[in-house]
């Protein structure tokens, strides 16, 4: 029978990389023979859920023709509990790919029954899998993505061989990245040059070793430059701990920044305690550090052999994630 993926009809912002991960998943699923099971969501001002019930009414009949259903979790739609309820009442083989989990921040997972119903649950990292197993999930049903795929339209021009330079790219929401304010005033980091990519540059982020590079469409990486790509968050240069359980969440999460940098052929710098640190080390994808203040010495001490291993590892992984191999591997079993 036909395999389907649930598609909630909603607009996306072309410059918002947060919407790129689910869009890439949909494209890979189409290539693998999945068809969209489309549901048009009502307006968010449908407070009583009257229009939602009308919009979601066809879902029950649509589910009857599906042989398998793939869901990206969480999905955002008004009164989404109505959709979940209909899915829970079917006996469809269900695959759920997790993008985010409130329970990792100490919150309550309102749609936990949907996760537990999944025949195949795809999560970010081994750490996220271990967490769910402690919550009573069946580990045999959990597949680990390691990092998200990142499909591209345009790559940067052919880069010279990796030499372990001091130019470090950071792409994302610059307004929320509090640690950026501390970069220019830190003498230990004065030998490094940070290239900042984002929609706007905060007024309190400035310095001789910082250059604002503007923004780019997530699928067009031609303007992304740097010797390294930085995956960091929080309010400190010496750790990724921050408010709202940020540090704890990074222990499980695979940031989409990681995929962005690797897709462009750029080695990465990640927090040693993050959920992706082991993946980065095992595949020779860059450096893992406890503090950004370690970077000048760590970069300077790199041997030619280590640089060659990183260059090779990044090249192999870049090819995989640009062709959707991470998700395809999870779909095989």
Task: Describe the function of each predicted region.
Residues 283-289:
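A short acidic/histidine/glycine-rich donor-binding loop in glycosyltransferase catalytic cores
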Residues 106-107, 118-142:
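A short, active-site helix/loop in glycosyltransferases that binds the activated sugar's phosphate group
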Residues 76, 102, 127-129, 175, ...:
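Alpha-helix capping/helix-boundary segments
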Residues 1-83, 88-93, 104, 273-278, ...:
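N-terminal pre-catalytic "stem/leader" segment of glycosyltransferase-like enzymes
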Residues 150-225:
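Conserved catalytic-core segment of nucleotide-activated headgroup transferases in glycan assembly
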Residues 89-91, 102-121:
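Membrane-proximal helix-turn-helix segments that form the acceptor-binding/catalytic region
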Residues 222-264, 270-278:
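Nucleotide-sugar-dependent
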Residues 290-293, 297, 303-333:
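A charged, aromatic-enriched C-terminal amphipathic alpha-helix characteristic of glycosyltransferases
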């Amino acid at each position: 029978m036909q395999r389907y993926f649930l598609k909630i009809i909603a607009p996306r912002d072309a410059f918002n990389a947060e919407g790129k991960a689910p869009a890439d998943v949909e494209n890979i699923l189409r290539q693998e023979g999945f068809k969209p099971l489309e549901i048009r969501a009502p307006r968010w001002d449908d407070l009583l859920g009257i229009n939602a019930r009308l919009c979601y009414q066809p879902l029950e009949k649509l589910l009857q023709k599906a042989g398998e259903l793939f869901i990206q979790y969480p999905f955002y739609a008004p009164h989404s509990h109505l959709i979940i309820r209909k899915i829970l009442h079917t006996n469809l083989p269900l695959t759920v790919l997790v993008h985010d989990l409130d329970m990792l921040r100490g919150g309550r997972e309102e749609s936990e029954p949907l996760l537990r119903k999944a025949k195949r649950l795809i999560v970010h990292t081994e750490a996220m899998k271990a967490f769910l197993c402690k919550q009573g999930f069946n580990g045999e049903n959990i597949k680990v993505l390691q990092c998200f795929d990142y499909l591209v339209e345009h790559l940067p021009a052919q880069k010279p061989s990796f030499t372990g330079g001091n130019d470090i790219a950071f792409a994302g929401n610059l307004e929320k990245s509090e640690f950026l304010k501390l970069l220019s005033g830190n003498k230990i980091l004065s030998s490094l040059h940070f290239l900042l990519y984002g929609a706007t540059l905060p007024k309190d982020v400035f310095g001789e070793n910082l250059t604002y590079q503007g923004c780019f469409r997530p699928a067009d990486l031609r303007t992304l430059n740097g010797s390294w790509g930085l995956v960091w968050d929080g309010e400190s240069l010496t750790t990724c701990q921050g408010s709202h359980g940020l540090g704890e969440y990074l222990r499980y999460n695979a940031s989409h920044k990681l995929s962005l940098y690797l897709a462009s052929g750029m080695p990465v710098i990640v927090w040693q305690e993050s959920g992706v640190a082991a993946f980065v080390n095992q595949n020779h994808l860059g450096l893992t550090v406890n503090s950004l203040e370690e970077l000048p010495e760590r970069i300077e001490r790199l041997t030619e052999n280590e640089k060659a291993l990183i260059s090779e590892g990044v090249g192999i992984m870049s090819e995989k994630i640009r062709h959707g191999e991470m998700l395809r591997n999870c779909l095989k079993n």
